[in-house]
């Protein structure tokens, strides 16, 4: 079954850290867990599944935040 209906196609791209070696904290949508998760972005290349904040990722990818625990 195709569960990708109604979701932004950028959110279905695999997580891509890019070719550079910086470590910028970013978020991507994990289509397996259906959640936005943190990763370290290298700073160049990569793809569109790359968001500056958890909130932005959840908004664009339509994640229903059901009282998700805040990261400390």
Swiss-Prot record:
Residues 66-72 form a propeptide. Keywords: Disulfide bond, Ion channel impairing toxin, Nematocyst, Potassium channel impairing toxin, Protease inhibitor, Secreted, Serine protease inhibitor, Signal, Toxin, Voltage-gated potassium channel impairing toxin. InterPro entries: Kunitz_BPTI (IPR002223), Kunitz_BPTI_sf (IPR036880), Prtase_inh_Kunz-CS (IPR020901), TFPI/VKTCI-like (IPR050098). Disulfide bonds join 11-61, 20-44, 36-57. Residues 11-61 form the BPTI/Kunitz inhibitor domain. Its main location: secreted. The record marks 21-22 as: Reactive bond. Residues 1-6 form the signal peptide. Gene3D superfamilies: Pancreatic trypsin inhibitor Kunitz domain (4.10.410.10). SMART domains: KU. GO terms for molecular function: potassium channel regulator activity; serine-type endopeptidase inhibitor activity; toxin activity. It comes from the Eukaryota. One of its GO terms (cellular component) is nematocyst. It is found in: Secreted; Nematocyst. Serine protease inhibitor that inhibits both tissue and plasma kallikreins. Has hemolytic activity. Inhibits voltage-gated potassium channels (Kv). Belongs to the venom Kunitz-type family. Sea anemone type 2 potassium channel toxin subfamily. This is U-actitoxin-Avd3r. The lineage of its organism: Eukaryota, Metazoa, Cnidaria, Anthozoa, Hexacorallia.
